[in-house]
Each structure stands twice: as structure tokens, then as C-alpha cells.
């Protein structure tokens, strides 16, 4: 399943039951589960998937023609990527 991206989460009866995917050739397909859906796409990717799924602030979602499924006002707000840089230097003088 390389070169495949998640377009949105499939929600049925207010429960996440799977994901809709797009492969490198543009073909759409669904993957469903009987257990749980874990979203882990980073600081920018996770809110993007949630918003495309209809999860987030109603006004922003409906403006883009996406059916609103769950009100969650904080989605897509306060976006920050938490970059870290480690520098090690050997000191030759005390």
C-alpha cells in the first residue's frame, strides 16, 4: 500500500469505522475495521484529514461543501510543527 494517501475517515452512526484512500493512479478505495481507527498524520496532516471527513468547526467545513458530521471547534486551530534540533560539539578546552 505504498504511494497511497488517506482522503478521509469513514463515519457511520457517529463512529469511525474506516478510511477512504487514494492510490498513486487516483483510484479510490475504502478500508474498514471492526476495531478502532487511529489517526496519526502529523501536525498538519491529521487536521486536514479530520476537516475533509467533516469533523471540526461547522462554518469552515460547510463553506467548502463538505457535509458536517461532528462539531469539534479546535480542529485546524493553533497549527504548529514542533521542530527540534540537537547540536553536539566536543569541547577541546576546559
Q: Where do the language-model regions lie?
A:
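Glycine-rich loop(s) and the adjacent beta-strand/alpha-helix scaffold that form part
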Residues: 5, 9-94
Amino acid at each position: 500500500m505504498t504511494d497511497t494517501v488517506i482522503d478521509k475517515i469513514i463515519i457511520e452512526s457517529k463512529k469511525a469505522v474506516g478510511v477512504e484512500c487514494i492510490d498513486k493512479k487516483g483510484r479510490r478505495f475504502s478500508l474498514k475495521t471492526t476495531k478502532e481507527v487511529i489517526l496519526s498524520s502529523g501536525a498538519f496532516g491529521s487536521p486536514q484529514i479530520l476537516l475533509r471527513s467533516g469533523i471540526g468547526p461547522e462554518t469552515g467545513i460547510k463553506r467548502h461543501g463538505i457535509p458536517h458530521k461532528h462539531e469539534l471547534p479546535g480542529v485546524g486551530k493553533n497549527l504548529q510543527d514542533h521542530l527540534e534540533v540537537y547540536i553536539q560539539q566536543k569541547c577541546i578546552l576546559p
